[in-house]
């Protein structure tokens, strides 16, 4: 990151840079990477991550490219690693239209989710706030080391900004961090394997899709070839 050199963005695949597309004022808009057939990922030492202190864990997440998954409020930018947040929020119940069902797509990755939560707890001075569906708490009700809260009602009830305002309102100079549930899993997966996880679940849905479904792909993958495989009205 130009504004914070400690923050690294890593490639989701091994290969070579095919092109760099720039926009106004030479701003980088897109980096096209030609993927190689092998998965030559950098391996990090993670066997003792549970024994790391806050600063050591921050360095591990920064060096491995996992830090950009953590965002801060206000403004919704990448979290400043030099700050300690007032709280960290993870909402597993989204109410915006066509949002994926995290209880479904993360059903087989609950241990990685738990590990990700445990890591986030090291970065703040209080347990993570974990939002769950009031009518169907599902797999997330048994997550330990969190402050559970329930979400009900129509959109925008699932908007995490509303949850922050209710549970940890921001005063002048305060920062609250938020993490997407699937990115919590990616953090946990990294802490289990030592490798950056590029996996991303995409919902192919909408009125024009005859057979909506979830697709597991890689972060940054071009979506048009995937969409072309579906019958559209």
Where on the chain are the PLM-derived regions?
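Generic structural motif
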Residues: 2-4, 9-19
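Generic structural signal for buried aliphatic residues
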Residues: 1-2, 223
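Buried, small/hydrophobic-residue-enriched core segments of structured protein domains
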Residues: 7, 21-225, 229-233
């Amino acid at each position: 990151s130009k504004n914070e050199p400690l923050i690294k963005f890593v490639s989701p695949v091994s290969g070579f840079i095919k092109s760099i597309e720039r926009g106004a004022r030479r701003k980088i808009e897109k980096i096209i990477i030609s993927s190689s057939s092998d998965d030559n990922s950098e391996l990090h030492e993670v066997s003792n991550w549970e024994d790391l202190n806050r600063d050591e864990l921050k360095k591990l997440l920064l060096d491995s490219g996992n830090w950009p998954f953590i965002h801060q409020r206000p403004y919704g930018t990448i979290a400043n690693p030099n700050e300690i947040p007032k709280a960290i929020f993870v909402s597993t119940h989204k109410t915006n239209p066509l949002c994926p069902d995290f209880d479904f797509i993360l059903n087989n990755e609950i241990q990685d989710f738990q590990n990700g939560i445990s890591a986030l707890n090291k970065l703040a001075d209080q347990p993570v706030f974990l939002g769950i569906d009031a009518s169907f708490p599902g797999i997330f009700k048994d997550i330990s080391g969190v402050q559970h809260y329930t979400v009900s009602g129509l959109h925008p009830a699932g908007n995490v900004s509303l949850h922050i305002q209710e549970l940890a309102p921001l005063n002048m100079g305060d920062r609250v961090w938020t993490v997407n549930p699937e990115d919590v899993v990616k953090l946990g997966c990294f802490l289990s394997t030592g490798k950056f996880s590029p996996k991303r679940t995409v919902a192919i849905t909408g009125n024009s899709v005859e057979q909506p479904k979830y697709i597991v792909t890689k972060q940054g993958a071009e979506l048009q070839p995937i969409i072309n495989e579906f019958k559209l009205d």
